[in-house]
Design a protein with these regions (language model features):
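Outer membrane beta-barrel
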Residues: 93-124, 128-247, 267-285, 350, ...
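N-terminal secretory signal peptides that target proteins for export/translocation
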Residues: 1-13
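N-terminal periplasmic/intermembrane-space "pro-region" immediately following the signal or transit peptide
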Residues: 30-112
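Loop-centered beta-sheet repeat module
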Residues: 248, 253-298
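Outer-membrane beta-barrel pore domains
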Residues: 49, 170-175, 195, 203, ...
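Bacterial N-terminal signal peptides
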Residues: 16-27
Length: 446
């Protein structure tokens, strides 16, 4: 082989090796440096970044909402409010929901369904004339809003008999201190055992007491303002409200005189209040009053002055439940009222009305159930109501306006928020027109 051939062969080998080395080196360098960056479109990048920020903000909002719902569900952050503290503010358990919230919206409610069965005959043996009735009696929603630790809005909207809507109360509270506050709006008159505490899981019996229907006409609410407070074991409420619309009074009681907040006539105002003492948990007793004119300009110089006073008490201890109330109402200018309305004989408005009741119950499961467990409470109730206790001179009373009620029944609470009540009521009066009843009530509160 010639020298030239040898040199050409070696040159070709060197060139081939160099090319192979270059080809292998370029991909390795490319892998080490990554892909060649592409110059971004500035418009597209801005839109994508804005969309990403919006999605992140939405995700944060969803997370916050989920946390808030979980907090509400679990009750985390609620303010502790004992039964005694709620009662001192005139609040039944469900109505107190807004006062347990730290801030913001609260929703609660209650309802009841009532079956009423009537005897075939009256006390004197004549036909009863009434057929059984099954009523979606009440469905209520409480809506409240705590603006801060001082200001609170509390409202109750009620549907009665499945079709009648009412604003039961609506007021704004200002808590000046922990133990004293101001209240204004459509207020529950602070009288008796039931008017402020009318939830079916609270009062005993399938129906509210007749004394707190005819004389203290619950649920009784009027427009006004006032104060409330509690010191140690004493609590009070004192309001000024519009007076009754007395032209609706009758021989059957004062119930028709309620104005319920609807364009209430306020020529006559009234003062109402109560004071209660709670010596030990589960026990309280006190008195309440109402005083004001009721004519609202319809009787000339007469103002149809109306005064109602009651004494009441409740003892719940070791499974026993004792409740009692006595109420008396006095009406001035009854003669002027009767003449103006052409009422004669036994149809006239009385100068004095009175009524009272005693309820005794015992939870037979109290010694075996834990707190918040099932409760089964048989009870008896004795009640007397007289809407013509004293008549003006020249008028006589009706024998049917003095009624005695004897009731025996039971209530069963599988949980504190649900109650089933069953009772039988015997009704008698001097007119022998009493008609016995058998009632069943299903109630709830939340």
């Amino acid at each position: 082989m010639s020298l030239l051939s040898v040199l050409m062969k070696r040159y070709f080998c060197l060139l081939t090796g160099f090319l192979v080395a270059v080809l292998l080196a370029v991909p390795a360098a490319s892998l080490a440096q990554g892909p060649t960056p592409v110059e971004p479109d500035p418009v597209t990048t801005g839109e994508e970044e804005a969309e990403e920020e919006e999605q992140e903000d939405l995700a944060r909002r969803v997370d916050l909402l989920a946390e808030e719902l979980e907090r509400l569900r679990s009750g985390e952050g609620e303010i502790e409010l004992t039964d005694a503290q709620a009662r001192a503010r005139g609040l039944a358990p469900s109505a107190a929901a807004v006062f347990r919230a730290n801030q913001g919206l609260s929703i609660a409610g209650y309802g009841e369904f009532l079956y009423e069965g009537y005897a075939d005959t009256k006390q004197n043996g004549s036909p009863g004339g009434k057929i059984p009735q099954f009523d979606a009696l009440r469905a209520i929603i409480y809506t409240g809003y705590r603006f801060n630790d001082k200001w609170v809005l509390n409202t109750e909207v009620e549907i009665e008999h499945a079709k009648e809507a009412y604003l039961e109360f609506a007021y704004v509270d200002y808590a000046a201190t922990e133990n004293f506050g101001f209240r204004g709006g459509l207020l529950l008159v602070p009288m008796g055992l039931v008017n402020e505490f009318h939830e079916p899981t609270v009062f005993m019996g399938t129906e509210r007491p007749f004394t707190e229907n005819k004389i203290i006409p619950s649920t009784w609410r009027e427009n006004g303002a006032g104060i409330y407070g509690a010191w140690d074991k004493v609590s009070f409420r004192l309001y000024t409200v519009n007076g009754f619309k007395g032209e609706k009074f009758s021989s059957k009681g004062l119930r028709g005189g309620r104005q319920k907040g609807y364009k209430a006539k306020a020529d006559n105002m009234a003062t109402t209040g109560r004071i209660d003492i709670t010596p030990t948990p589960g026990v309280f007793f006190g008195t309440s009053f109402y005083k004001g004119g009721s004519a609202q300009g319809t009787l000339g110089d007469a103002d149809l002055g109306t005064t109602i006073v009651d004494v009441h008490g409740q003892v719940q201890i070791r499974g026993f439940d004792f409740r009692g109330l006595y109420a008396k109402a006095n009406i001035d200018d009854a003669v002027a009222f009767n003449k103006a309305n052409n009422l004669e004989g036994s149809n006239g408005l009385a100068e004095e009305l009175e009524g009272g009741y005693i309820i005794i119950g015992y939870n037979v499961l109290s010694q075996t159930s834990d707190i918040g467990g099932p409760a089964f409470t048989p009870y008896i109730k004795f009640e007397r109501v007289d809407t013509q206790a004293s008549m003006p001179v020249g008028y006589n009373r009706s024998l049917s306006t003095l009624n005695n009620f004897r009731t025996i029944g039971f209530e069963f609470k599988p949980i504190p928020n649900v109650v089933i009540k069953v009772d039988h009521m015997w009704v008698t009066n001097k007119a022998n027109s009493g008609l016995n009843q058998f009632n069943v009530n299903l109630g709830y509160g939340f």
